[in-house]
Curated annotation (Swiss-Prot):
Residues binding Cu cation 4, per UniProt: H416, C474, H479
Purpose: Lignin degradation and detoxification of lignin-derived products.
CDD domains: CuRO_1_Tv-LCC_like, CuRO_3_Tv-LCC_like
Protein name in the entry: Laccase-1
GO BP term (any one): lignin catabolic process
Residues annotated to bind Cu cation 2: H87, H130, H475
Length: 520
């Protein structure tokens, strides 16, 4: 009998461990509505496998990911269809699996499922996933995604890198996105690893991250934000950045990190302070700022410390992260020649806003009824033939492209973080800098486009080696919903042959188009 009880205890312990473990590379993601109260306030949300943020998805470089998304949404106050983007993955040959609704697919209808099936042959690092339909991810459909490299070149810099060292940042709202203002004046709460407090719920539980003295931890910081950027710090501790948006990075020691929506950093933290509790801080750039009552906070707890809230104080940051100091671990050639305009095609993105919608080069993005990928597969071969008119830019194959984003007071809400799908790009001019670096700039997939006050003209470069329509947009989701986006139709003649689509993908549009608008 004792052997049976031992076995039972082992099984229970194993199940408990699995409940907190990452899923993947083959997994079901069931999307439902549920009441959640991550900050002590209960509201209906969009959850993944029962929770928000959704479960950590993990795998190894070289894996084939087969992620079956099952849409069981029923709440009419939120979008009932869905579509999921796997943020940071190049999707080479699987443009149809990238996820943005009406760019790469029709949404998945409620009561239906869709299998995202893609290879990750040459990428590793920290990614995430989120709804790419309307503002649905703000209501909860967002989660972290890590691809491990068995031959990680930074492996000797840390001792621990597991599910428990992923740190997610979430802006949380008490009102569903479609019921609230078009441009909220700040989140109600900041959630760190799914827990937090609002100014009216200061007794809610906070996340605790445990460390063992003397160990070195690779923390993977992921901004799942819909809007604010955060200044992240841990009292009494420096952080050594080793990864930027899944790009291995030359080690850089900082004491605070400004992280914009959708960006990721890995940093090494050495647990070398006195055994105690230390505040983890993620201060948003607007809204409920500061730390009164434990808002915008979590707890770093050394093994052996009492289970109490920290009493540590924040010191002035003397080594904040500056993007110009980030460099790839392995120097990577910058596309084009090392002079201004030394590319095959340079495009300037002129921003504007009319009080309701954002514009790029005079056009506000409105989702087409037929996905751009389907338009191309169906025979449209020129940008002028692709909808939405004025928002699709044709890019030639195997060309060096430069994009500039001059900051302007005409587009309020800066700094706007811009994300390019299907690529990592070289940031040849960063926000806050007037220097053009063609030598060793960081590569990443989300960049702050800075502020007009700084006279910023953030400039990026990439090479067109990945046929397909790829979204370029502000990752403040409320701004994207207001049209702050364009589509790059890359190598149009080769899109169909390079991206064979499964029958299930072809079935998405007829199913979605048959829905009553109230069920979409």
């Amino acid at each position: 009998m004792s052997r049976f009880h031992s076995l039972l205890a082992f099984v229970v312990a194993s199940l408990t461990a699995v409940a907190h473990a990452g899923i993947g590379p083959v997994a079901d993601l069931t999307i439902t509505n549920a009441a959640v109260s991550p900050d002590g306030f209960s509201r209906q949300a969009v959850v993944v496998n029962g929770g928000t943020p959704g479960p950590l998805i993990t795998g190894n470089m070289g894996d084939r990911f087969q992620l079956n998304v099952i849409d069981n949404l029923t709440n009419h106050t939120m979008v009932k269809s869905t579509s999921i983007h796997w943020h940071g993955f190049f999707q080479k040959g699987t443009n149809w699996a990238d996820g943005p609704a009406f760019i790469n697919q029709c949404p998945i209808s409620s009561g239906h499922s869709f299998l995202y099936d893609f290879q990750v042959p040459d990428q590793a690092g920290t990614f995430w996933y989120h709804s790419h339909l309307s503002t649905q991810y703000c209501d909860g459909l967002r989660g972290p995604f890590v691809v491990y490299d068995p031959n990680d070149p930074a492996a000797d810099l840390y001792d621990v890198d597991n599910d428990d060292t992923v740190i997610t940042l979430v802006d949380w709202y008490h009102v569903a996105a479609k019921l609230g203002p078009a441009f909220p004046l700040g989140a109600d709460a900041t959630l760190i690893n799914g827990k937090g407090r609002s100014p009216s719920t200061t007794t809610a539980d906070l996340s605790v991250i445990s460390v063992t003295p003397g160990k070195r931890y690779r923390f993977r910081l992921v901004s799942l934000s819909c809007d604010p950027n955060y200044t992240f710090s841990i009292d009494g501790h420096n952080m050594t950045i080793i990864e930027t948006d899944s790009i291995n990075t030359a080690p850089l020691v900082v004491d605070s990190i400004q992280i914009f929506a959708a960006q990721r950093y890995s940093f090494v933290l050495e647990a070398n302070q006195a055994v105690d509790n230390y505040w983890i801080r993620a201060n948003p750039n607007f809204g409920n700022v500061g730390f009164t009552g434990g808002i915008n906070s979590a707890i770093l707890r050394y093994d052996g410390a009492a289970a109490v809230e920290p009493t540590t104080t924040q010191t002035t940051s003397t080594a904040p992260l500056n993007e110009v100091n980030l460099h790839p671990l392995v120097t990577t050639a910058v596309p084009g020649s090392p002079v201004a305009g030394g590319v095959d095609l340079a495009i300037n993105m002129a921003f504007n806003f009319n009080g309701t919608n954002f514009f790029i080069n005079g056009t506000s993005f409105t989702p087409p009824t037929v996905p751009v990928l389907l338009q191309i597969i169906s025979g449209a071969q020129n940008a002028q033939d692709l909808l939405p008119s004025g928002s699709v830019y044709s890019l030639p194959s195997n060309a060096d492209i430069e994009i500039s984003f001059p900051a302007t007071a005409a587009a309020p809400g800066a700094p706007h973080p811009f994300h390019l799908h299907g690529h990592a790009f070289a940031v040849v001019r960063s926000a806050g800098s007037t220097v053009y670096n063609y030598d060793n700039p960081i590569f990443r997939d989300v960049v702050s486009t800075g502020t007009p006050a700084a006279g910023d003209n953030v400039t990026i470069r990439f090479r067109t080696d990945n046929p397909g329509p790829w979204f370029l947009h502000c990752h403040i989701d409320f701004h994207l919903e207001a049209g702050f986006a364009v589509v790059f139709a890359e190598d149009i003649p080769d899109v169909a042959s390079a991206n064979p689509v499964p029958q299930a993908w072809s079935d998405l549009c007829p199913t979605y188009d048959a829905l009553d608008p109230s069920d979409q």
